């Protein structure tokens, strides 16, 4: 797909920042996770490569099934959250993950570490980062909104 086509698609879908995570992008995370735990993919829609990737490697993960992530509470039956949130809602996702008090991993751009509000949140609540040594290409073999 040409750069011009990407820009045109982005312009027609400006209200949507939906990007499907390539399945192989969960691999670096797996060594930090316990196979005896159940994880929640908060943005799994009709298909989720995060769900299929975890399943393929023998991890227990459940999708949202259309449930609004912001209705989730600490007592829900999962041990941690793993998701690629809509970038326009990354602050809300971060705050809600911290409020639930469960471990979480969010796929976010490195620039998400910046900002006074987020910086303060990370300083107060703590954070760890797993930085990939490659740039994730959300446009290869997947349908994106841009």
Language model regions located:
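Class I S-adenosyl-L-methionine-dependent methyltransferase catalytic core
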Residues: 1-146
